[in-house]
């Protein structure tokens, strides 16, 4: 696929077209979310989704919740056959830039300790570990790593730092 056709489109959960909802519901199964949990999330006022699209095909997405100046990244997903190509980093950078310009100052996330690829992605993006919750996840048992990134605009040109 030609990267010049990729675009990131933001949606609130309620705005998501049903076809995109179905893709997200399927992707969320990788995070052990069932269909009811995904559909409930679509209805939350604070739920937002950033979809990475190639024309009308969803390549990946970020799902988050925001309250005041904080956001929690709940879902960062790239299709399995497209991983390792830098799309996750590009999508994450785009989302963080958007959040910064909207006045979000604290971004949190939680990731399985065993998910080395995701941990590396988040560390490269400037997230730092706050705490590790031992044996937090089940099936399989794994520790949860809670991470945070502080967002701020630099004085130069309003760029995120």
Task: Describe every region a protein language model picked out.
Residues 79-93, 102, 106, 112-120, ...:
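Conserved glycine-rich acetyl-CoA-binding loop
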Residues 3-6, 10-81, 92-94, 98, ...:
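Acetyl-CoA-dependent GNAT
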Residues 110, 123, 128-145:
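Conserved catalytic-core motifs of GNAT/GCN5-like acyltransferases
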Residues 68, 113-115, 133, 151:
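Short, flexible active-site-adjacent loop segments at beta-strand->alpha-helix junctions, enriched
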Residues 82-85, 89, 134-136, 143-145, ...:
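Acyl-donor (CoA/ACP) binding surface of acyl/acetyltransferases
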Residues 38, 118, 133:
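Acidic, amphipathic alpha-helical patches
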């Amino acid at each position: 696929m030609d990267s010049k056709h990729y675009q990131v489109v933001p949606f609130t959960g309620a705005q998501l077209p049903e076809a995109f909802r179905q893709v997200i519901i399927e992707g969320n199964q990788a995070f052990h979310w069932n269909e009811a949990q995904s559909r409930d999330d679509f209805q939350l006022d604070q739920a937002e989704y950033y979809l990475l699209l190639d024309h009308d095909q969803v390549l990946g997405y970020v799902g988050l919740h925001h309250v005041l100046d904080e956001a929690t990244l709940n879902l960062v997903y790239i299709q399995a056959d497209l991983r390792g190509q830098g799309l996750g980093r590009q999508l994450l950078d785009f989302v963080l830039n958007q959040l910064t310009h909207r006045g979000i100052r604290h971004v949190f996330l939680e990731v399985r300790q065993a998910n080395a690829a995701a941990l590396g992605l988040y560390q490269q993006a400037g997230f730092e570990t706050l705490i590790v919750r031992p044996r937090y996840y089940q099936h399989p048992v794994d520790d949860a790593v809670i991470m945070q990134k502080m967002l701020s605009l630099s004085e130069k040109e309003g760029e995120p730092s």
